[in-house]
Structure formats: structure tokens, C-alpha cells
């Protein structure tokens, strides 16, 4: 039997709760039967920094892969040049895969000329807005292969990687840029009957006719205060009798130094609305319960690379309300002139966020209500 290839993964510690960590976990566990993995698991202040953890035996037992191999090196930050050099020598990976904003990896691109002589550099990339980030072109040049998480990202990188206007820029071949959207585990996120005690815990023992669900970090670009204001206006529009049977469930921290004091927002603009905070960190199957409790999941972030919560919501059979931005567009299933848009279409289209051009022309699937921001002026 041929020896499995080994991949050195540079990303958020896959045991953590960030979107990058969650997708790192899904990527590793979904391919652990094909590849061996060594991860530099990043966190801001990692409590286990510097100690290699071999979790291979646990993976073998829990996932039934007898030859599974996974080691994690917890680290403060995403690493550095000396660490990668050391790991190349000790672990001898067949490829390096890094994941998240390229600005965190400038130190890696600075040494690409020595690394790529023996080990290819792979990049799992996302970019959430136009115009095309020309300043990233040199970073993309440093990678042997780029997997694009959204169709918009694919269009951006295909356009930029075709440029050859500088001496060091070489257009990439077709196989070097691929559309690889996040995968949602359908064994976890699916329509299911929610246990009565769990529903009671989330909704405080009350019965509601309509449950709107929001699941994000309490940070400004996610616009949680705007969600509260929108819910308040919705309640005003339908009248008190119906509004009393509606609730907004916000799975987030009510107060965050990087975001907003949401209880204060509620007191100021929506004191009479039913708004519940779900603060407890939940397991994946419990998050699936949340989606199944909801009648709709909303994400109106002003910039969004992908939007895991709404993608998981769709798989649970719950419709979504989303801003037309970044990767959220992919989840709407847009058709233009009767044709379902593909990643290749975005090479020409760029993005559908210009409401004057696309509202009414781009038709979503029945599971999605797209929201175009009228503040985006067509140029």
C-alpha cells in the first residue's frame, strides 16, 4: 500500500470555535483517510502553546480510520519562518496548506523561493469584496495552488492571476486556481426533531409562531445592532398581537469589546420586542437544533467571506435572509436569464452586490431572501 502524503496545515487550531477552525477540522477529518496531517494550531494566546499533541489514536478510535495520523502544535499566532523551516526538516511534509487572510502570511511569502524548491505552497483563500485587491497579486504569485472558498473569490483570483504586467508575474494555469467552497457535514446539519427540553431551554419555555435566528460573533461588520433595529421595525409593522408571538434569538455574546453592547441597544430601540441571547458555547448537533428551531436565519453582515451559519441553516432546511455580499451570494442559488450562476460566471460578473444592476434580474432560490444594500452606489 502506498504511503500517504503528509500536509502541513497552518490555520486556527481545529479544536477551537472560529469559522477557520471549524473548516480546518472538517477538511482534516474529511481527508484523514487519504492524508496525514500536522497542524500549527493558531490562537491569540494559546494555553497549550509549544507542546505537540498527537491525537492520532483518538481519531482512529472515534472515526474508524486505522491509519489516521494527526498532530497539532498549538501556537501563539500563525507561526514564523524559523518554525516552518524546522517543521519541514522534522516532519518532511509533501505540501504546506495555509488558510485565512494573506496579510497574516507575508513572512511565509518572503521565504517562498526556498520552500517551493521542495515543498509546494497551497492557499485556501477568501476575499469578501471588490474591487480586485491588486496588492494581493504578489501573494498569489507565491502559491502553487489556490483553492477559492467563494465564487466571488474565484473570479477575483482568476482575473488577478491572469495579469502579466510585471516581470515577476506569471499567469497561472487553469488547474492552479480552483473553486472549493466550504463543505457542510450533512450527517450533522440536517432537518431533525428538536428535543422538547432543548427547545424549552433556548426559548425560555414559551411558544412562538415565528423564530428569527442570528448566529455570529458580536463584531461591528456583522451588524448585530442593525438586526435588532430591523426586527423592531418588523414587529411594529405586524402589530403587537402578532409581534408578541415572534422572537429573535441571537447566538452570541451580548457584550463584546470588539462589537456592541447589545442589551443597551435593545433598551434604546426595541424594549418591547422578544429578544433572547443564547450565550452558551454549543456542540455541533446543538447548533443544528438551533437551526431547526428557527423559521429563518439572518445574516446582514456588510462584508462576509462565506457565512457558515446560513450555509448550515440551509442544510437544516431553514431558509435564510442575507446581504448580497461576498460568499453569501453563493448560498442564494442565483439564476440570471434562467441560468444558474457558476464560479466561472463570476470571472466576468465580479459580484452581484450592485443593486441597480442586479436587483430583480438575479433570481434567488426559494430558500433565500437576498437583501441589496441601497447605500452601494452604482459606479
What are these regions (language model features)?
Residues 9, 205-222, 228-231, 248-249:
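Conserved donor-binding/catalytic core segment of Leloir-type glycosyltransferases
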Residues 302:
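Aromatic "clamp/platform" in nucleotide-sugar-dependent glycosyltransferases that forms part
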Residues 163, 189-205:
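A short helix/loop element that forms part of the nucleotide-sugar donor recognition site in Leloir-type
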Residues 152, 183:
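Carbohydrate-associated surface elements
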Residues 319-322, 339-348:
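Short hydrophobic beta-strand element within catalytic cores of glycosyltransferases
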Residues 259-281, 285:
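Nucleotide-activated donor-binding/catalytic signature segment of Leloir-type glycosyltransferases, i.e.
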Residues 377-379:
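Conserved small/polar residues in nucleotide/adenosyl-binding loops
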Residues 1-57, 91:
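N-terminal subdomain of nucleotide-sugar transferases
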Amino acid at each position: 500500500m502506498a504511503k500517504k502524503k503528509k500536509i502541513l496545515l497552518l490555520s486556527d487550531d481545529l479544536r477551537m470555535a472560529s469559522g477557520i477552525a471549524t473548516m480546518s477540522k472538517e477538511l482534516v477529518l474529511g481527508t484523514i483517510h487519504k492524508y496525514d496531517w500536522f497542524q500549527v494550531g493558531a490562537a491569540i494566546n494559546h494555553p497549550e502553546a509549544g507542546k505537540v499533541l498527537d491525537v492520532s489514536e483518538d481519531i482512529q478510535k472515534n472515526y474508524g480510520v486505522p491509519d489516521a495520523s494527526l498532530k497539532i502544535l498549538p501556537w501563539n499566532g500563525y507561526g514564523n519562518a524559523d518554525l516552518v523551516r524546522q517543521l519541514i526538516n522534522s516532519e518532511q511534509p509533501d505540501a504546506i496548506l495555509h488558510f485565512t487572510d494573506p496579510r497574516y502570511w507575508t513572512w511565509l511569502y518572503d521565504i517562498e523561493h526556498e520552500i517551493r524548491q521542495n515543498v509546494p505552497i497551497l492557499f485556501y483563500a477568501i476575499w469578501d469584496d471588490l474591487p480586485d485587491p491588486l496588492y494581493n497579486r504578489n501573494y498569489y504569485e507565491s502559491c502553487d495552488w489556490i483553492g477559492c472558498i467563494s465564487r466571488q473569490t474565484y473570479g477575483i483570483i482568476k482575473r488577478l492571476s491572469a495579469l502579466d504586467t510585471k516581470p515577476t508575474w506569471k499567469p497561472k494555469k487553469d488547474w492552479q486556481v480552483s473553486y472549493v467552497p466550504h463543505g457542510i457535514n450533512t450527517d450533522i446539519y440536517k432537518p431533525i426533531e428538536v428535543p422538547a427540553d432543548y427547545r424549552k431551554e433556548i426559548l425560555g419555555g414559551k411558544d412562538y409562531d415565528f423564530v428569527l435566528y442570528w448566529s455570529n460573533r458580536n463584531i461591528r461588520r456583522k451588524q448585530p445592532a442593525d438586526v435588532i433595529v430591523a426586527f423592531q421595525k418588523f414587529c411594529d409593522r405586524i402589530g403587537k398581537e402578532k409581534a408578541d408571538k415572534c422572537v429573535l434569538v441571537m447566538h452570541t455574546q451580548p457584550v463584546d469589546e470588539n462589537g456592541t453592547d447589545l442589551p443597551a441597544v435593545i433598551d434604546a430601540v426595541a424594549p418591547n420586542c422578544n429578544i433572547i441571547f443564547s450565550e452558551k458555547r454549543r456542540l455541533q448537533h446543538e447548533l443544528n437544533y438551533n437551526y431547526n428551531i428557527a423559521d429563518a436565519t439572518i445574516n446582514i453582515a456588510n462584508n462576509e467571506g462565506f457565512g457558515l451559519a446560513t450555509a448550515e441553516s440551509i442544510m437544516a432546511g431553514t431558509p435564510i435572509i442575507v446581504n448580497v455580499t461576498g460568499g453569501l451570494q453563493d448560498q442564494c442559488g442565483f439564476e440570471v436569464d434562467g441560468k444558474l450562476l457558476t464560479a466561472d460566471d463570476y470571472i466576468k460578473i465580479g459580484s452581484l452586490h450592485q443593486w441597480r444592476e442586479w436587483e430583480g434580474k438575479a433570481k434567488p432560490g426559494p430558500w433565500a431572501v437576498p437583501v441589496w444594500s441601497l447605500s452601494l452606489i452604482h459606479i
